Amino acid sequence: MRSYKAKMVEPITLPSRERREEVLAEAGYNAFNIPAENVYVDLLTDSGTGTMSDAQWAALFRGDESYAGSESFHRLREAVEDVTGFSRVIPTHQGRGAENVLYGCLVEEGDVVLNNAHFDTTRAHIANQGGDPVDCPVEGARDPVRDAPFKGNFSADRARDVVDDVGAERVPVVVLTITNNSTAGQPVSAANVRETAAFAEEIDATFVIDACRFAENAHFVRRREEGYEDRTVADIAREQLSHADAIVMSGKKEALVNIGGFVAVRDADLFERAKQRAILYEGFPTYGGMSGRDIEAMAVGLREAVEPPYVEDRVEQVEELGRMLEERGVPIYRPVGGHAVYVDAGELLSHLPSEQFPGQALVCELYREGGVRGVELGSFAFPGADRLELVRLAIPRRTYGREHLEHVADAAAAVGERAPEVTGLEVVSEPPTPELRHFSAELAPV
Ligand code: F0G
């Protein structure tokens, strides 16, 4: 049962089939180029696209816009301390701002950073510092059908191999991304958090948790890990974060806001250095990259994220979409993750070779069929990488209802029925930076 109802609505329309065809061609068969007014159900991302609560909207009016020493900052600091246990906090404009501040202090030319799996912006910030981001997924993480409770875990064995190779002194940072966005939103167990923290300590590295989906992760721990079934999500979340030396947070996910983020650290010296860098790139450390009113909304949202009805509801809605797709014979990555269902386009459109971007072809077909927007995470987004051809259907928080999800599942099923007729795509123009090509490149049917 949903634990909220709508108090404000936003009209959406499904453009006609002819119009959708035109829009696709005008967008160069790239969903990022589609104007949002032409999208019916938008599952491009769960980042900043959710619905705020009435309490969050009310909090906006309390925003203290003082340049220094804002009251709003103090309320955020308190919320962060209550929810995460960290008292040294710097607000940033979003998650990648937090990454820039933190990794700019910790990573130098020639360093290696280990992560269960780097999210794109994390990878880019490490690389921007001259570092080498290395993923350490567990066995089976890239197997879309293997059923295991914590496929998002960090492999300390793999990490030890890397350290044996390069030397511990070259690995200043170990990151754990919970849940693991680059591995189909899979959770990380509490045991793995402890194990990763111990590994980081062993090599004298700073242990960072990318906490943007921390409540969803805590929910999975409660559901799947022995000994946690009677604990609250809030309690589990705090326990998980208690092992970290620092956290980076995109508030656009589980602080339930449209914009914002923060970095929080334990060490007083690192805090001072991070504040200096924040002044350079974000703003004075009591507002960072945010307005006072947005900080207020984030302080309220962060507390809401660990309240019992919210996260249960949230993860179950994602599971529900997974179930609907499976009932209609659409292949998905199993088990379903916390924020999104990842459709296995390589399986659904198995006649298309990876050079013809089966994932991107599916993204286009979902739009053509139902005005649904998802995002490709395969050969188009990650050129040259050996990856599954996935399409992520990320669900904005507290935003869509069952009818919308049924519409999405029906659209995917309709594409599945005519799968052999779906044509592949080729890139016709792309920006100079290959890592960013999926955001703006244009394609055409082969
Ligand atoms: N870390 C993770 C694990 C993320 O998923 C994201 C963003 C970031 C950091 C960066 O945060 O966008 O606030 O700067 N993920 C979004 C997504 C964009 O669609 O998955 P940001």
Give residue spans per PLM region:
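A short, surface-exposed helix-loop junction/capping segment
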Residues: D54-F61, A345
